[in-house]
Structures are given as structure tokens and as C-alpha cells.
């Protein structure tokens, strides 16, 4: 080939975000086709300052990056970690190494990340950088209809894994300083006991679930006692991308096919079905980004916003509502960053119905506590459990019944609410029913050692039902329900119809999302000083 026909050199930059893994990573595989390559993770101030970010999230990400940097270095790929706004960091790095292609996975994130991506796209166009994004979940961009969505999901999940089959040529020799630490980022220790970070830990967790722990999955997932061991515990790894959804799906299908135990196969099929729901809820945010900030059903606007009780909110955040199961679950979540789904739903239901708190402040608090915070799932579930979708069944949990059903021996409550350690079991779910003599024997004076119930269970539940069902019977609510159903409601088979992603980025949309993201990053939230 003559010199005039030679292919010009191309330099790829792999932009890592919530895909902190080596295996089944399409951007890394694509980078092998370029002359040379390097990778980058950006610690963005917009992330650190966002109201849903917690130090534990940063800590987990740094742990993932430490392992990934070593793995990529063994293949000749440098991994840079830089601090700053995305466009600023990319522009500076472009000046240093003149990369020609930007490779990354698609992301369905909170408002600030969408605004960031719009800005990065504009910058890439201005300097003639080709930015290629790859899918990594079942979420479909610019989706016009949910018809066929299940087939697309299945096709993506059944496609061959994207595995690295070669070595990289390092772009240039760059100084790679040590990874930042929480201290160097100005972040205080979080004090949580977190799951192990990184792809190796993720694979161990997946293996143990599919081989042993998942046997009682269907029976054990509702109780916080048994769910801790019998749930997959993969959610943080899916959230930070140390495992791909496709890897989990295919490994699960292999395990189902290979086990001779029909009961185990049945349990794993239940888990496999939830993988598709994972992407289904993410699709809701992809289709309608405003659900992070606004009610699905706008007829619910004003329902709770003007009645926010700061004292109730503080008690709920701190696990001192006087309802033992609520308090035990909240304290456990704060300490570990994880809680099983039913108990998460109970916490939200109690806040939304018993305490009549709006889902946005409570959702931000929980987002910071959940190590596995996934925006699409989180905000969809916050609204479902708060009754503001306009179409889903109203789920109102009795904290007393949940204690009796899910912690019948009181082991979970006694572990996380030590004030109740000596309370007799018949009173443990409702300690306020002890007479004073029993309280003294149990060393638990209600109102002194442990709070009295913050609200009356039956009175609060009745008031919430009256308001919610009254609203749903209104003409406006019925009319809007049809529209919400068309955009987000479930079809037969559990695959709901959906609207379409913003196909183009209008200036008005960008300004609105940017304004909301900026306001909530700079304005102290009402819960901001409780768990810094």
C-alpha cells in the first residue's frame, strides 16, 4: 500500500463512567481497533456536589478503579483518573494527547449527567472528535414504542459477550499519579460497612449466588433477616458496572439449565425475571427524564409539597419514629448501604403515607444511603411507593404487620434497635403497648429510652387512603391515568408501553434540566446536614 493510501493513525480515549470492569466492555473492545488507546475516569464536581451523591458511592468507585487500573495496565492500557468538569478534563487531555475518538457506554443517569453529556457532545463536534456510545443494558434510546422491547432486550442479553482478545498499544507515556482518596477529595469517612468493590468481588458474589445462596431466593427475599444472604447482592455491582447485565443474565441462564434441582431452577428463574424489570424501570427515566423531579401524574402536584413536616422527616431519617421495624430498617440501611426490596418499599410507604412526606426529599436521602443507587429504578420506585404514578396499586405497609411477618422472633429489631433488646417478644412490634411496670423491667421507658409512635398507625393510614383514593376518583386523575398508562403502564407479560426519549435536545429542555440540577447541587437540601 502506498503511503498516500495509508490509514491515518487513530487514538482512542475510553471514557469510563458506571462501567468499571474489564470484561464484556464494548468501548474497550472497540479501542483495540485503533492505533493506540488510553482510558479515563473523571471525578466530576457535579457528581460530588449532587444531592444524591454520598461519600460511600465515591469510596466504592475508587475501590473499583484501583482494581481496574491494575487489570488494564496488564493489557497495556493506561487508566487516568482526573478531577474536574467533563468538558474541561477532556479538553485538557485532548491538548496533551490529541485523541481522535471518544468511546463510552450510554448512561441513563440523573439530570446533571444528561446536561453533562449534552455539553460533551457539543465539545466533540467543535473539535471534530468522533464520540461513539455503546449500549450496556436493555435501555433503548429514542424509543418510539414499547412494542418489541422484550425482543430487543432478549437479543441484547443473548448476544455474545464483548471480551478483550488482545493487548493495547498505550497512547503515550503519561504521568499517572496515585488514585485520589476520600481525604484528598475533601470528603469525610462515611462509616458504613460496604460490600467489597471491584470486578473480582462481583464475580465471586455472582458465583456464590448461582451455586449456593440463591436456593431460597423466592422465599427469603422479603425478610431483612434472610434476604441479606439469599438475595443476589449484585445491585451495587450492576449500578457501578463491575458486572454487565448481559454477564449476569447469561450466567443465570446457564445455571438454570445445568442444575438438576428443580427447586433451585425455579428460584433462579424468579431472579432472571427481575433482571428484565431492572431495565424496564431504567427505561422509564430514559423516556421521561422529568420523573426525577416531577410526579408521573401531574394531578398529584401539590399533594404533599406544602405539608412537609421537618420534624417527621428528621425522625424518619434517624430511625426514631417509634415503629421498631421502620427504625431497624433505616438504621441497618445507614450502616450498610443495603436493604432488601420489601423493606425499602416499607420505608418509602411509611414516609409517604403515614408521615405524608413528599417523595423528592425522602428519595434524595435514600439515594445517598443506597450503595446501589440506580436513578431510573430509584425514582420510578419512589413514585410507585408514594402513589404518584396515577396507575399503580397503592401499597400502604403496616409497620407492625411487617415486623410480625418478616421478623417474627425479633432478631432483626433487637440487632438494630438495642433500646428494645429486653422488651418481651409479644410487645416488640408495638412496644408502646407495654404498661409501665413492663417498661421498667425491660429498661425501656417509652418516650424516654425509645420514642412513642410519631403518628397513630390507623389514623394516619385512614387519612392517607381517604386523600389518595379521593384524588384518584377525580375526573382529572382518571383522564391523566390513561396518558400515564400509555407512557409507562404495564402490558400483558409485564412489559409496559412507553413514550419516546428526547430525540433531539431542545434548548428549553436543556435549560430546564440544567436549572433543576444546578439548584439542587447548590441549594442546601432540608436533609443535607443530617448525614453529610
Label each region the model flagged:
Residues 233-425, 532:
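Active-site-proximal binding-pocket segments
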Residues 2-272, 282, 389-532:
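Active-site "lid/cap" and pocket-lining segments within catalytic core domains
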Amino acid at each position: 500500500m502506498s503511503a498516500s493510501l495509508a490509514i491515518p493513525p487513530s487514538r482512542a480515549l475510553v471514557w469510563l463512567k458506571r462501567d468499571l470492569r474489564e470484561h464484556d466492555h464494548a468501548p474497550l473492545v472497540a479501542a483495540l481497533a485503533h492505533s493506540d488507546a488510553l482510558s479515563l475516569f473523571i471525578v466530576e464536581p457535579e457528581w460530588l456536589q449532587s444531592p444524591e451523591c454520598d461519600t460511600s458511592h465515591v469510596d466504592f468507585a475508587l475501590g473499583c478503579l484501583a482494581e481496574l487500573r491494575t487489570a488494564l495496565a496488564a493489557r497495556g492500557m493506561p487508566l487516568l483518573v482526573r478531577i474536574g468538569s467533563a468538558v474541561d478534563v477532556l479538553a485538557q487531555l485532548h491538548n496533551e494527547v490529541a485523541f481522535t475518538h471518544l468511546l463510552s457506554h450510554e448512561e441513563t443517569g440523573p439530570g446533571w449527567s444528561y446536561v453533562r453529556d449534552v455539553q460533551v457532545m457539543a465539545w466533540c463536534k467543535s473539535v471534530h472528535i468522533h464520540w461513539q456510545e455503546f449500549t450496556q443494558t436493555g435501555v433503548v434510546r429514542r424509543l418510539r414504542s414499547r412494542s418489541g422491547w422484550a425482543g430487543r432486550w432478549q437479543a441484547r442479553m443473548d448476544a455474545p459477550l464483548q471480551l478483550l482478545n488482545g493487548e493495547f498499544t498505550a497512547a503515550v507515556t503519561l504521568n499517572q499519579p496515585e488514585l485520589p482518596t476520600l481525604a484528598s477529595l475533601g470528603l469525610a469517612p462515611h462509616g458504613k460497612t460496604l460490600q467489597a468493590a471491584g470486578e473480582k468481588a462481583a464475580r465471586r458474589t455472582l458465583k456464590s449466588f448461582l451455586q449456593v445462596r440463591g436456593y431460597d431466593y423466592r422465599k427469603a427475599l422479603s425478610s431483612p433477616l434472610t434476604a441479606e444472604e439469599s438475595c443476589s447482592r449484585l445491585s451495587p455491582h450492576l449500578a457501578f458496572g463491575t458486572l454487565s447485565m448481559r454477564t449476569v443474565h447469561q450466567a443465570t441462564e446457564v445455571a438454570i439449565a445445568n442444575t438438576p434441582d428443580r427447586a433451585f431452577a425455579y428460584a433462579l428463574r424468579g431472579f432472571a425475571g427481575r433482571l428484565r424489570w431492572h431495565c424496564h424501570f431504567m427505561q422509564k427515566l430514559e423516556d421521561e427524564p422529568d420523573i426525577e423531579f416531577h410526579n408521573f401524574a401531574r394531578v398529584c402536584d401539590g399533594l404533599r409539597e406544602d405539608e412537609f413536616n421537618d420534624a417527621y422527616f428528621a425522625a424518619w431519617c434517624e430511625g426514631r419514629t417509634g415503629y421498631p421495624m421502620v427504625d431497624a430498617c433505616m438504621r441497618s440501611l445507614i450502616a450498610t448501604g443495603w436493604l432488601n426490596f420489601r423493606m425499602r418499599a416499607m420505608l418509602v410507604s411509611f414516609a409517604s403515607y403515614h408521615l405524608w412526606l413528599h417523595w423528592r426529599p425522602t428519595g434524595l436521602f435514600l439515594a445517598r444511603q443506597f450503595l446501589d443507587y440506580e436513578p431510573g429504578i430509584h425514582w420510578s420506585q419512589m413514585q410507585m411507593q408514594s402513589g404518584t404514578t396515577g396507575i399503580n396499586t397503592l401499597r400502604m405497609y403496616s409497620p407492625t404487620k411487617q415486623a410480625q411477618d418478616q421478623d417474627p422472633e425479633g432478631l432483626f429489631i433487637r440487632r438494630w434497635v438495642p433500646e428494645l433488646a429486653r422488651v418481651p417478644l409479644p410487645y416488640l412490634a408495638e412496644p408502646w403497648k407495654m404498661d409501665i411496670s413492663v417498661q421498667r423491667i425491660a429498661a425501656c421507658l417509652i418516650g424516654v429510652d425509645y420514642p412513642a409512635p410519631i403518628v397513630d398507625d390507623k389514623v394516619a393510614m385512614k387519612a392517607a387512603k381517604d386523600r389518595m383514593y379521593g384524588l384518584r376518583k377525580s375526573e382529572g386523575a382518571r383522564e391523566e391515568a390513561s396518558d400515564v398508562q400509555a407512557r409507562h403502564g404495564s402490558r400483558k407479560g409485564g412489559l409496559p408501553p412507553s413514550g419516546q426519549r428526547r430525540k433531539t435536545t431542545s434548548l428549553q429542555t436543556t435549560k430546564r434540566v440544567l436549572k433543576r440540577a444546578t439548584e439542587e447541587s447548590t441549594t442546601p437540601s432540608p436533609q443535607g446536614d443530617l448525614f453529610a
